[in-house]
């Protein structure tokens, strides 16, 4: 992804980001979600296939064409993304960090469009880790402002295109205006079923497991359940991903060549297939996503069983 920016525009944009982190109005990059194809596979037209971990298609559902490299019966139901490399992408181009994050929003837009059109039912994005509060305040402010602006700009489109929004993580530490917008987005889109977009903000996989255990312990203390009732299914029901029909990703993609999970969906990724891309997130587009999906479709998911 390339930018044609005059030097003056870069510094003007950077000044605007740093001086007004709560109200970014940079027009250089806009997040406008293209319409998802009306014949795209809808979530409620699929039947879960537990053995293969892919979506079985209801024959009555009209389908949009897939790239010839992909097989529809092997498409993952749930894709999770660790979107890494925005800052490095900007640094390589001599641009402010803020413009790297702006470019990352464009990549998000494209992946949402592809998921909706290719029949992926859940897309989970790791937008902000609980550890990211350790970054410089100006960068955190930029991230919060970008998230708020993008969500506000796209909420109407999400509602129209059948995209359901859910947020996981501790939202209590987010700016009040962002908390209010999140509540509005969740309420507005709760009946949508074409694509479930889950955004992890101020999220920690370890904390998710801890809070689930605390909730279960309290239920035991209150005589709601007994210790013998505790199993993996019960724990999963108390995780923050309990809002998702398919809470465990079939495929995790991480960009920018980093080979770690970074405290993301630690319980849910137990049997997920992993794909690591060397592309920085702003450069991750259709070709890179297609490569990841092709790799996924060539694998045999055994869930601890012998290979066939």
Curated annotation (Swiss-Prot):
Record keywords, A-Z: Chloroplast, Magnesium, Metal-binding, Plastid, Transferase, Transit peptide
Protein's GO biological process: plastid membrane organization; polyprenol biosynthetic process; response to cold
Single GO term (MF): magnesium ion binding
Targeting signal (transit peptide) range: 1-45
Top enzyme category: transferase
CDD domains noted in UniProt: Cis_IPPS (cd00475)
Annotated localization: Plastid, Chloroplast
InterPro entries referenced in this protein's UniProt entry, alphabetically: UPP_synth-like, UPP_synth-like_CS, UPP_synth-like_sf
Record-listed E.C. numbers: 2.5.1.-
Entry's family note: Belongs to the UPP synthase family.
Protein name: Cis-prenyltransferase 4, chloroplastic
Species, as recorded: Solanum lycopersicum
Gene, per the UniProt record: CPT4
